[in-house]
From Swiss-Prot:
Functional note: Subunit of the V1 complex of vacuolar(H+)-ATPase (V-ATPase), a multisubunit enzyme composed of a peripheral complex (V1) that hydrolyzes ATP and a membrane integral complex (V0) that translocates protons. V-ATPase is responsible for acidifying and maintaining the pH of intracellular compartments and in some cell types, is targeted to the plasma membrane, where it is responsible for acidifying the extracellular environment.
Gene3D superfamilies (UniProt xref): 1.20.5.2950
Subcellular location, principal: membrane
Quaternary structure, from the entry: V-ATPase is a heteromultimeric enzyme made up of two complexes: the ATP-hydrolytic V1 complex and the proton translocation V0 complex. The V1 complex consists of three catalytic AB heterodimers that form a heterohexamer, three peripheral stalks each consisting of EG heterodimers, one central rotor including subunits D and F, and the regulatory subunits C and H. The proton translocation complex V0 consists of the proton transport subunit a, a ring of proteolipid subunits c9c'', rotary subunit d, subunits e and f, and the accessory subunits VhaAC45 and ATP6AP2.
Organism per entry: Manduca sexta
Subcellular location, record wording: Apical cell membrane
Record Pfam families: V-ATPase_G
Name of the protein described by the UniProt record: V-type proton ATPase subunit G
GO biological process, one term: synaptic vesicle lumen acidification
Gene Ontology annotations for the cellular component aspect, listed alphabetically: apical plasma membrane; presynapse; vacuolar proton-transporting V-type ATPase, V1 domain
Family per similarity comment: Belongs to the V-ATPase G subunit family.
């Protein structure tokens, strides 16, 4: 009987060591996965930053700076407003004359649906 309990003790100890080894292996695997995930996130972040930098270079090269674009838009807007003001000055009298003629020249007529009863 003593040999059986000794054998059982050895089996239990071996099972305990195996469980510890499995536990350690799981911990190492989890640690490796966490490290791989962090490395992947770092790599993605570096790639994103590089693409952002390339885009900003492209944008600056092809579109100019925001201040430059804003100044260009302001200049174009001023030119168009000046052109519209000139058109108003040249057409103002003719438009007023046409509007007044339409207001003063009233030609009363019966509506087409009106029926004398």
């Amino acid at each position: 009987m003593a040999s059986q309990t000794h054998g059982i003790q050895q089996l239990l100890a071996a099972e305990k060591r195996a469980a510890e080894k499995v536990s350690e292996a799981r911990k190492r695997k989890a640690k490796r996965l966490k490290q791989a995930k962090e490395e992947a996130q770092d790599e993605v972040e570096k790639y994103r930053q590089e693409r952002e930098r390339q885009f900003k270079e492209f944008e600056a090269k092809h579109m100019g700076t925001r201040e430059g674009v804003a100044a260009k838009i302001d200049a174009e807007t001023r030119i168009k407003i000046d052109e519209m003001n000139k058109m108003v000055q040249t057409q103002k009298e003719a438009v007023i004359k046409d509007v007044l003629n339409l207001v003063y020249d009233i030609k009363p007529e019966l509506h087409i649906n009106y029926r004398v009863v």
